[in-house]
Amino acid sequence: MSRNPGMTDEAIIKMYKSGMSFKEMGPIVGLSDRAIRNVMYKHGISMNREQYSGQPRKHKVNEDYFKVWTHEMAWVLGLFVTDGHVNKQLHSIYFSQKDERILQLIAKYMEADYVLAATGPTKTTPTLIINSKEIKKDLKMLGIISNKSLSVPFPNVPEEYLASFVRGVIDGDGWVQKSGYVMNVTSGSQDIAARLLFVFQSWQLRSEITITVSPAGNYIYRIWVKGKYELPKLAEIIYNNAASDNFILHKRQRMSQRYFI
């Protein structure tokens, strides 16, 4: 096997130290387990048995995090539904977010070690790694499994925490026009789209769905909220129980700006 472009020894070592297993690293790096180990030996990097065997290194995390509903948990779940990934083979989940402050906050809420996957020429978005069999099981109970993007269901969120969950969804896959008149959420899941539309309509917001088809032939759903008065109303609902920092700053600013006009 030959290395993938950009995979220097330093990048491989950083990836290993982030907690990724040899099995996870192989397709990214383009090397076999043995070749990756040789890189570690070459640079005097100590290896534990779990990594040698291909299992992810254990990190600190509150394994009961998704068992108890709170506004913070609902927000994190909304982010995971949109920006998360469940590893099919390993007991690992990943959060990807351009705003690294959000990843730091997720790690804080989940009492998790702040371990990021290595970035490279083809992987530039910061990704938080959490290794936990229990958390993976709890997410499955909520209907969230690997390869979820086209089939993930809208979780059964208690009414009390619904606004916080929707805030997480908007922070993950939402877009807000700079002028503050238009917002949409993009999803490949018909259930997410239909249920989100129902929620917006139940909040008496002017909303609609548009559907397009991707080059791969998959449906892409966009759920819209439009109007000078609609977005401030949405902002009032979803930020009511937010802390001072658990949201994407520019999205809140854009949605809320019409309050002051």
Q: Where do the PLM segments sit?
A:
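Internal intein/HINT superfamily modules and their associated LAGLIDADG
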Residues: 1-261
